[in-house]
Amino acid sequence: MINVDTTQLHYVYNRKIIKYAHIDLGTKCLLECPMCPRTEHPEIIEFSKRTYGEVKIKDFKKVLSYAEHITFCGNISDPIYHPKMLDFLEMTIKYPKHRNVYIHTNGWGRKQKWWDRAFDLSKNKVKWTFALDGLPHESHKYRVNQNGEEVWEIMKYAKSLGVQIIWQFIPFKYNENSIDEAVKLAKEYNIPIKLRRSSRFADRHEHLDLKPTAEVLWLDKLEFLQKNSKDRKLKPPKEKIQIGKTSFKTEKSLYKELKPT
């Protein structure tokens, strides 16, 4: 399934350029996250299998002809499970120098040989985002079937090779008190960490035992201010935000990479 991000659509009519393409390569994922559409609505997966199947190389080539930047990020799949993912990655980096590649993954289920090749292809224009929701030993509480400790080893390995990576950390009830320690751990290995609010609690009456509380809800408050302000371009407050014992600057973006001050 290939989607064009309409908020970032940029046609130059004489060249027919699409600025960003978001690609969901198929329907496969090894995890069973409680609030994922895969878990809650398995009929969607069956429909997608019948209707779309997996992205084929011939179709991917068409995307490369038009898209400047590529994001591999599954709504119902994880890109690393596509059997041709390394081929797609190799094809992408051979295109013009201005092309950037973003890969979002839970990072679990591939053998070392696969990662060796993936990271060898990722030295320049590729940025990986690993979803590790909590400290390595606790991420599986939401990302069911994930071995967070092995994913953390893969992340450290990637960093040691000079690969660009980000640690994406979604606050939940079980991990909100681990944020300080996670920030220290990320800093120790010089890995940027991003706190990202889950939108899947909206209008929901189940899984409330997972919903974070206290200071981490500043993300919800900030989004509320943005949506309800007369000035739709309202910027986040410039003062520091305190989460646990760690303070963060909040300029630029609601979902920015958070770096300890």
Predicted regions and their residues:
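Active-site and channel-lining beta-strand-loop segments
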Residues: 256, 260-261
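Conserved strand-turn element in the central/C-terminal portion of the radical SAM core barrel
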Residues: 155-178, 198-200
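A cross-domain feature marking catalytic cores of carbohydrate-active enzymes
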Residues: 74-76, 103-107, 130-134, 169-171, ...
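C-terminal accessory extensions appended to soluble enzyme cores
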Residues: 237, 244-251, 255
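Conserved alpha-helical substructure of the radical SAM core
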Residues: 2-127, 138-149, 153, 189, ...
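Short, electropositive alpha-helical surface patch
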Residues: 88-92, 128-131, 176-196
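Flexible glycine/acidic-rich beta-alpha junction loops that bind and position SAM and/or redox cofactors
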Residues: 174, 194-223, 244
